[in-house]
């Protein structure tokens, strides 16, 4: 891509890579946050060569993610988590086949996004993913405002 001075790198992340906060998905979310940090840094490195990057944050799409063949739930090893773990595992199992996102529509949307000029640096896919992103933005704004005075008073006098 550098040689031809053009290209487009698309990474599929997750809504959990943008706004985590679900019980028992810390390792998954960490992997997605890592992917996103890498992509955001990569964007600055490759943009001078005409290479674009896009992070895709899909919400819940009706894929094989929650099927028994695709998902293994770890056995509980810490009793402190048992009261939350059981109901959550049952919830996830109940959602298989009920996810609101249509993967065929997502595929068509990704083709549209890939053909935009310039393509977006981020595509948040699905109404649930947008709602999560908007909540994350609101949470960040509230955290900034809660400590704005303290935070902005840290420069040398």
Regions found by a protein language model. Give the residues of each.
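Active-site helix of classical SDR
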Residues: 31
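SDR active-site lid
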Residues: 48-119
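Residue(s) in the substrate-gating loop at a strand-loop-helix junction
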Residues: 14
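Short-chain dehydrogenase/reductase
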Residues: 109, 122-132
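Rossmann-fold scaffold of SDR-type NAD(P)-dependent oxidoreductases
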Residues: 11
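Active-site-adjacent segment of SDR/Rossmann-fold oxidoreductases
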Residues: 19-20, 41-51
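Catalytic tyrosine of NAD(P)H-dependent dehydrogenase/reductases that use a Tyr as the general acid/base
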Residues: 28
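A short helix-coil junction within the Rossmann-fold of NAD(P)-dependent oxidoreductases
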Residues: 1-5, 19
């Amino acid at each position: 891509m550098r040689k031809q001075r053009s290209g487009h790198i698309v990474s599929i992340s997750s809504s959990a890579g943008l706004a985590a906060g679900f019980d028992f998905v810390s390792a998954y979310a960490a992997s997605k946050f890592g992917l996103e940090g890498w992509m955001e840094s990569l964007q600055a490195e490759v943009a001078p060569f005409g290479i674009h990057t896009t992070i895709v944050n899909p919400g819940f799409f009706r894929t094989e993610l929650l099927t028994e063949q695709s998902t293994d739930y770890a056995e509980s090893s810490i009793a402190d988590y048992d009261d939350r773990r059981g109901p959550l595992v049952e919830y996830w199992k109940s959602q298989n086949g009920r996810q609101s996102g249509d993967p065929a529509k997502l595929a068509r949307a990704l083709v549209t996004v890939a053909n935009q000029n310039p393509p977006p640096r981020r595509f948040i896919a699905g109404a649930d993913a947008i709602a999560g992103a908007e909540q994350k933005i609101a949470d960040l704004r509230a955290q900034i405002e809660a400590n704005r005075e303290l935070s902005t008073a840290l420069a040398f006098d």
